[in-house]
């Protein structure tokens, strides 16, 4: 990946605070991080993740959560439709764009999505893992945004995606000792799926109201 954090989906860009938005909606440079108080932990994850987002079926994005306050407020103000999104200033948001335009069969898309998600999580853990210091993922929740407007998971039932994520994450956690499995909480909106991952080892899931 280049020195820019690629942002090819507009619906998240529109929620970045106006004074932080770049002139182009297609990329956000690391220079924009200097406008916010970004922790060393976030910067380390962002730099590590840049080197990992090169798969054929998926693009991985890193954005400091401070940029997405309006997005969080938008979702939580519509509680009649969405589960609540727990918000904190740290850590980062991991956004995953899955699927290809030409792929529409949910079984095929699910295979690619879940496999690539698992592989990417393992890569991130590996990049952060230090044998001597045992540096694991942050204790705070990490959000995974699975963009579905372009094929992706659009035909995949949310329950299936949620449990696939849970199972594959647990498998990935077994790769490294002392790495605890996270919480998972599913959040749907018009353009994608947000799965929140925490680290207190208690699965969370709330169905959408019918």
From Swiss-Prot:
UniProt keyword annotation of Mitochondrion present: yes
Superkingdom classification of source: Eukaryota
GO cellular component, one term: mitochondrion
Organism name: Schizosaccharomyces pombe (strain 972 / ATCC 24843)
Protein location: Mitochondrion
Name this polypeptide is given: Uncharacterized protein C30C2.03
Keyword set includes Mitochondrion: yes
UniProt keyword terms in alphabetical order: Mitochondrion
Principal location class: mitochondrion
